[in-house]
Regions:
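Extended substrate-binding grooves/exosites of carbohydrate-active enzymes
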Residues: 1-125, 133-139, 144-153
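Intrinsically disordered, low-complexity Pro/Gly/Ser/Thr-rich segments with frequent PxxP/GP/PP motifs
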Residues: 142-173
């Protein structure tokens, strides 16, 4: 099972006519701000039917609820328990998209944005709406957009009943 494959390898696999799926058992390591290249992975995976996706490492920080000498709460991990005495993964224990108590880290917002089921892009003077759902038409959704100039709304429009089949896009004005 591949993990952390370079984009060139993914592009090569995606460009071939193959029947076997390609699934990354681990990708977009969430340590710090390293999920920042998630969009590139997602775009490659969506270009080919046999690119099946993968698993972001890591979902949750693996820290232990602790109170410091100063009385403040913190998530203990690795060397907090005597690095000189034990083998440990140092800060590779706290490298997830959410804290041990499931508080979201900023990187989770990037994942949410990249994985969204409905995408919008400006194409010339139209808004293109992409329906990334597998089974749901967009007609059940309501949309609204604003046009702003120097932070002030100069135009608003509501869109109701936009028909767009799964996997398709529609341009609206």
């Amino acid at each position: 099972c591949p993990m952390y494959s370079p984009f060139s390898e993914l592009e090569h696999y995606a460009s071939r006519k193959l029947s076997k799926p390609y699934i990354l058992c681990e990708y977009a390591h969430a340590m710090g701000n390293s999920t920042g290249n998630l969009r590139e992975f997602y775009d490659i995976m969506n270009r080919s039917p046999h690119m099946q996706g993968g698993c972001i490492w890591d979902w949750v920080d693996q820290g232990i609820d602790a109170i410091g000498r100063d009385g403040r709460h913190y998530w203990a991990y690795g060397g907090d328990f005597g690095a000189w005495m034990y083998t440990h993964d140092e800060n590779f224990c706290c490298n997830g998209l959410v804290s041990p108590d499931r508080t979201p880290h900023p990187g989770l917002m990037e994942v949410k944005k990249v994985y969204q089921d409905i995408e919008f892009e400006l194409v010339d003077d139209k808004v293109r709406i992409h329906n990334n759902h597998n089974f749901t038409d967009l007609a059940k959704y309501s949309f609204r957009y604003d046009i702003q100039c120097e932070g002030k709304i100069v135009y608003q429009k509501a869109l109701e009943g936009v028909k767009c089949a799964p996997g398709e896009y529609v341009d609206v004005t």
